[in-house]
Amino acid sequence: MLTRFITDVSTRFNPFSAKAKAARLFLSFLPPNARSNGMNITTQLLPRNSTETPLLYVKFKDGKEMNLDVENMGIKSIVEEVDRHSRILQKQADLNDG
């Protein structure tokens, strides 16, 4: 997963819920040095009996914001969506550099 162009990641989920699996996996895909490279990562853990829906919010360097439905999307779909926009930004960066 291309994380170079991601500036903000916010998650809210119940760690005991099966519906939050995609949000947990997405956080595990982020590199260990993401915070030191300028990415703002915010995680809010909900109590076990919470009925709030899980949330995954991603913001890119170009200002695009994505609110992803982690309850109904699998991790592959989420990574696809994020990578799709990251590849567009990568192409633009390559064109500007080249």
From Swiss-Prot:
Cell compartment(s), UniProt: Mitochondrion
Keywords: Mitochondrion, Ribonucleoprotein, Ribosomal protein
InterPro entries, alphabetized: Ribosomal_mL53, Ribosomal_mL53_fung
UniProt cross-references to Gene3D superfamilies, sorted A to Z: Glutaredoxin
Disulfide bonds listed in the record: none
Role of this protein: Component of the mitochondrial ribosome (mitoribosome), a dedicated translation machinery responsible for the synthesis of mitochondrial genome-encoded proteins, including at least some of the essential transmembrane subunits of the mitochondrial respiratory chain. The mitoribosomes are attached to the mitochondrial inner membrane and translation products are cotranslationally integrated into the membrane.
UniProt subunit comment: Component of the mitochondrial large ribosomal subunit (mt-LSU). Mature N.crassa 74S mitochondrial ribosomes consist of a small (37S) and a large (54S) subunit. The 37S small subunit contains a 16S ribosomal RNA (16S mt-rRNA) and 32 different proteins. The 54S large subunit contains a 23S rRNA (23S mt-rRNA) and 42 different proteins.
Protein's name in the database: Large ribosomal subunit protein mL53
Gene expressing this chain: mrpl44
